[in-house]
Swiss-Prot record:
Its main location: membrane. It holds the Pfam family LRR_6. The gene is CD14. It comes from Bos taurus. Glycans are attached at residues 38, 150, 280. One of its GO terms (biological process) is positive regulation of toll-like receptor 4 signaling pathway. Induction: Up-regulated in peripheral blood monocytes exposed to bacterial lipopolysaccharide (LPS). Detected in lung. Detected in brain and kidney. Detected in trachea and bone marrow. Gene3D superfamilies: Ribonuclease Inhibitor (3.80.10.10). Keywords: Cell membrane, Disulfide bond, Glycoprotein, Golgi apparatus, GPI-anchor, Immunity, Inflammatory response, Innate immunity, Leucine-rich repeat, Lipoprotein, Membrane, Repeat, Secreted, Signal. Residues 1-20 form the signal peptide. This is Monocyte differentiation antigen CD14. InterPro entries: Leu-rich_rpt, LRR_dom_sf, Monocyte_diff_Ag_CD14. GO terms for cellular component: external side of plasma membrane; extracellular region; Golgi apparatus; lipopolysaccharide receptor complex; membrane raft.
Length: 373
């Protein structure tokens, strides 16, 4: 974490310790486009990261170690390096595998505030200690995309609101996977005015009730795409209720890779968001078309389920783009392939997708513009 290009400028005196007899932990490609650092050595040469200052994409893993030793540089004012930071090419930054004091993370964000960074990924991090007091105005980067995977925070569910205060407005894509807490105190959360894509996939313990707690009412007014793959969703009606409570109007909803149950006959009917046009229910274990789906759906993916018959036209009156591949009524061997992807030498589409989901833990979601200034 500490070796991001910006913080290097803050901590340069303590980092210039070059060892000629050790393998470089950082590698920069021939085009000076991508730089990857993996500090797994017991005594890492942090200064190797200096070469990453010319790259557009930077990925840094701290080898699972604590970065508390660098706290002494966290109070350095990055303004003195503003011109140098602005000149850096980096647009995408990934930081991972470290125990990071919250004070140090904030110092990095303050330095990044002078950069042209657009996409930030935090992965396998343990953020420790209290977060510094909220600034009078956001001093961090103007991100378009923020992705977090397996990041824990001492502050519990308050982490998103605290992190949000250090980011400039304008975030359009937010991905949160393997979160330790998604029960956000809504009073401490500011409105995500520009957020169009929210991906809460790969949070299998979330469930319908957890979604209700995560989607704070009126905080996502511009939301267009909501992804809930492998998020422990239980029924379409439960998801519908959470969307209604949050007063969001997504145009596209992904509920694939959840074991969905059919809504109970006596359940209260839910009114889906009127803007919803596309719904992904693939890999949901469905044996029949769920009742009470959004009435204005035009795109529906029911592939790789357990449907024994083709849906009737009156069940899906407005759908003109329907995907049914991998269901038993089309392929008698579909169930066997879903249960055992390696049953034959040729891996069918449904099995390939399931294997990909298992290996990656998530399908990368990058909706919205990738225009870098």
């Amino acid at each position: 974490m500490v070796c991001v290009p910006y913080l290097l400028l803050l901590l340069l005196p303590s980092l210039l310790r070059v060892s000629a007899d050790t393998t470089e932990p950082c590698e920069l490609d021939d085009d000076d486009f991508r730089c990857v650092c993996n500090f797994t050595d017991p005594k890492p040469d942090w200064s190797s990261a200096v070469q990453c200052m010319v790259a557009v994409e930077v990925e840094i893993s701290a080898g699972g170690r604590s970065l508390e030793q660098f706290l002494k540089g966290a109070d350095t004012n990055p303004k003195q390096y503003a011109d140098t930071i602005k000149a850096l090419r980096v647009r995408r930054l990934k930081l991972g595998a470290a125990q990071v004091p919250a004070q140090l993370l904030v110092a990095v964000l303050r330095a990044l505030g002078y950069s042209r960074l657009k996409e930030l990924t935090l992965e396998d991090l343990e953020v420790t200690g209290p977060t510094p007091p909220t600034p009078l105005e956001a001093a961090g980067p103007a991100l378009t995309t923020l992705s977090l995977r397996n990041v824990s925070w001492t502050t519990g569910g308050a982490w998103l609101g605290e992190l949000q205060q250090w980011l400039k407005p304008g975030l359009r894509v937010l991905n949160i996977a393997q979160a330790h807490s998604l029960a956000f105190p809504c009073a401490g959360l500011s409105t995500f005015e520009a957020l169009t894509t929210l991906d809460l996939s790969d949070n299998p313990s979330l469930g319908d009730s957890g979604l209700m707690a995560a989607l704070c009412p009126n905080k996502f007014p511009a939301l267009q795409y909501l992804a809930l793959r492998n998020a422990g969703m239980e029924t379409p009606s439960g998801v519908c209720a959470a969307l209604a409570a949050a007063r969001v109007q997504p145009q596209s909803l992904d509920l694939s890779h959840n074991s969905l149950r059919v809504t109970a006959p006596g359940a209260t009917r839910c009114v889906w968001p009127s803007a919803l046009r596309s719904l992904n229910l693939s890999f949901a274990g469905l044996e029949q078309v769920p009742k009470g789906l959004p009435p204005k759906l035009s795109v529906l993916d029911l592939s790789c389920n357990k449907l024994s018959r083709e849906p009737r036209r009156d069940e899906l009156p407005e759908v003109n783009d329907l995907t049914l591949d991998g269901n038993p009524f089309l392929d008698p061997g579909a169930l066997q392939h879903q249960n055992d992807p390696m049953i034959s030498g040729v891996v069918p589409a449904c099995a390939r997708s399931a294997l990909t989901m298992g290996v990656s833990g998530a399908l990368a979601l990058l909706q919205g513009a990738r225009g870098f200034a």
